[in-house]
Curated annotation (Swiss-Prot):
GO terms under cellular component: extracellular region
Source domain of life: Eukaryota
Family designation: Belongs to the short scorpion toxin superfamily. Potassium channel inhibitor family. Alpha-KTx 29 subfamily.
Signal peptide (from-to): 1-28
Domain remark text: Has the structural arrangement of an alpha-helix connected to antiparallel beta-sheets by disulfide bonds (CS-alpha/beta).
Disulphides: 32-51, 40-56, 44-58
Tissue: Expressed by the venom gland.
Protein name: Potassium channel toxin alpha-KTx 29.2
Main location class: secreted
Location in the cell: Secreted
Amino acid sequence: MKSVCGVLIILVVLTTMLSISTFSTVGAEADCPISEAIKCVEKCKEKVEVCEPGVCKCSG
């Protein structure tokens, strides 16, 4: 069971990083750090409008 949990955790991390890289190229600013992007994604789900250091705005 431990190996299954480990695989699931890795999948979640990879999915999160992929979604962050998508946001950084599509809607968010290039100077948005990864930690800030993670907070924005958690806060806004898939509706991040602005992501800058210390600033996170959701669209819609």
